[in-house]
């Protein structure tokens, strides 16, 4: 690989800069990565755009590329527990994405909601025709919710892994496979996209049998093995 602008910029920083960052990260690692004895755990390396999954014996048994948040939408550092996975999830679009991306896209192309299989609802949960809304007047808050159907092309892909956190970020599949071929994979809104979401699902299951694995594959429109 050739040396680019970013590499030169970081090489020109003083040694004290890296020393301070090392001390900060060592302290962070000391309190952040605390797995329960005898339990599986996962580490997402944001800087390397990689994820490692470890079994109860602390053996790394799964490794894959990931996509993380962009410079404007950084993936937060956190520690949590994965509680459940959801197949073919709907995407409830965050308010900031509605305001900053979806509304401008719709104003440029009024077929945006239809093409992306998105539906609009008012605060009472009633479906609203997006053509009847004066979107231009909503510059701060938007009194509507937008939900993307759980069909092919859904931004969350075919499966999502949910865990408690104050940032509304998760691990999930993605239809945007092209990003995994990039060296810089800072392309998301903050969530972590998994290169091999199906393998990750099998890792999390206690003792998956072939029947259960095939049921998951079928739900994700993947051909069963048996």
Segments and roles (model prediction):
Residues 6-226:
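Well-ordered beta-sheet/strand-loop patches within structured domains
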